[in-house]
Amino acid sequence: MNRKFFNNLICFVFSIILLTSCIKKKEEDKCLSYAKAPVTKIEGATTASVNQELNLTISFICFNGCGQFGNVEETISGNTTTIVVNAKYAGCICTQDVPTRTTLYKFKKSQAGTYELKFLQTENNYLTHTIIVQ
């Protein structure tokens, strides 16, 4: 009787392991990543009025066809803003091209002054756009 119970217990444990190992994981989480994207061009005005919103067109490179705009990280120090564009890579099978994508960056200041926007290209190398707010 003891041997039969032990065999049933082993079968039960292996059944649980087998069933839980077959649970499908979310496909979208498996092939999703983010990476810093080098900015190649900034287009937009260089002057603005106080509280005027400017739209700057930012061009950046993705490293394969799955790359799209992800988000922007800003670090503000005085009148200088350092901006990092992050590309979002969603998909397991991607073309091996190196596309240039664009996004809008909104700029608005409540005080007059000269503002420097530094967009990351490569580590410690920036593309700078200066805006004078009057």
Model-identified regions with their sequence ranges:
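Bacterial Sec-dependent N-terminal signal peptides
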Residues: 2-5, 15-40
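First exposed extracellular module after export/assembly in secreted or surface-exposed proteins
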Residues: 31-134
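Low-complexity, glycine/proline/serine-enriched flexible coil segments
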Residues: 11-12
